[in-house]
Each structure stands twice: as structure tokens, then as C-alpha cells.
């Protein structure tokens, strides 16, 4: 990447939409909407600033290895990734939700999650789930899934799930209920550590603008 150019890694969906006001605060406007375009590289109103559209779980990897100078990733993704090689200057307070344990209605979670007990947990977030239950002294068999998490307890694949919950409507519609809060999740600004040094003059005004926009909410 050129020293006078910046690449920003973003994912489609809620994070992208809630990032637009932050970009605007820094004077950055995308030339296209990723939901309407098949392009994975999108220009902006600045010739030297571009966006790359990647999977949410890949944002830290693109930033860590310098394919992007900075990006926006959920705390859940960063915990699973480990955050190696990343500078995390700001909680942007967007895409807020909660990481929760959920079970089918009628399941006695309190009794089943006592120290020394064993549970089968289905989740996209094995690191978060394993750490949480280890802290409780509960033995767990982690079943990694990539979607339709709510199905797992209903068909006997797992006793419980660990997943992101926003409104809880999906859980309710599938006969599940949230029974334990693990951690609050929001999205963070992540910056490549090398880029922070070599492109400081370009990055610092954007970081400051993002910070100002967050405080102004």
C-alpha cells in the first residue's frame, strides 16, 4: 500500500450502516453502497482512501497483516481472534448487543450449570464460551456451528447455546430463553500497529474525528 493511501476494512450489514455517520464525521463518504454493489473494493470521496468489504470475522486478519490500515470489528470477533498486532484506540459504541447463554424453555439451567457439571454448548464463539464456563467451574463440550444456533437445543445437539442477542425475538420465536449474560458487545476501531507509525498523519485526524462523534452521541 502507498504511504499516502488508506484502506479501511468493513463488513456489510449493521456495522457498515452504523459506521457511515462516523466516516462522515471524518469527511469520508463511500461512492457506493456495498449492499447494492458486488464490488469488494469501494472508493470514497478521497482518491487516497478506499474501503474493502470483508466478512466480519476477517476484519482483524486484514488489519493485522496490513492488507487494511484500519477497520471496525465487534468485540466478539476480537476476543475470538485474540487481537494480536492490533491497536484498539476506541470503543465506537455501535452495533451493540449482548453475549448470552440461552436454553430451551423448561431446561433447568441453574441446576445443570453448577461447578463440576458438564454441558454441551453450541456456539460460533468457542473461546468466549470456553472461558466463561471455565470461570464457573463447569465442564463443557463445545460444538462449533456457523449459523441457525437456535436449532441446536431443540434437536438435542446441545444443552445450551452461546450467542449474540439483540432483541431476543429470535430466541422467543424458537422456544428459547436467555438465562445468563456473559459480556456486552459493541464494535471497536482497530488499527494496524505499523500503519499507525508510518501513516500517523493520515490516521490521527480520522481517529480523533471518530472519537469526537462517539462523545457527541
Swiss-Prot record:
GO terms for molecular function: ATP binding; ATP phosphoribosyltransferase activity. Its EC number is 2.4.2.17. It catalyses: 1-(5-phospho-beta-D-ribosyl)-ATP + diphosphate = 5-phospho-alpha-D-ribose 1-diphosphate + ATP. Its main location: cytoplasm. It comes from Neisseria meningitidis serogroup B (strain ATCC BAA-335 / MC58). Pathway: Amino-acid biosynthesis; L-histidine biosynthesis; L-histidine from 5-phospho-alpha-D-ribose 1-diphosphate: step 1/9. GO terms for biological process: L-histidine biosynthetic process. One of its GO terms (cellular component) is cytoplasm. Keywords: Amino-acid biosynthesis, ATP-binding, Cytoplasm, Glycosyltransferase, Histidine biosynthesis, Nucleotide-binding, Transferase. Lacks the C-terminal regulatory region which is replaced by HisZ. Belongs to the ATP phosphoribosyltransferase family. Short subfamily. InterPro entries: ATP_PRibTrfase_cat, ATP_PRibTrfase_CS, ATP_PRibTrfase_HisG, ATP_PRibTrfase_HisG_short. Heteromultimer composed of HisG and HisZ subunits. The keyword Ribosomal protein does not apply. HAMAP family: HisG_Short. This is ATP phosphoribosyltransferase. Catalyzes the condensation of ATP and 5-phosphoribose 1-diphosphate to form N'-(5'-phosphoribosyl)-ATP (PR-ATP). Has a crucial role in the pathway because the rate of histidine biosynthesis seems to be controlled primarily by regulation of HisG enzymatic activity.
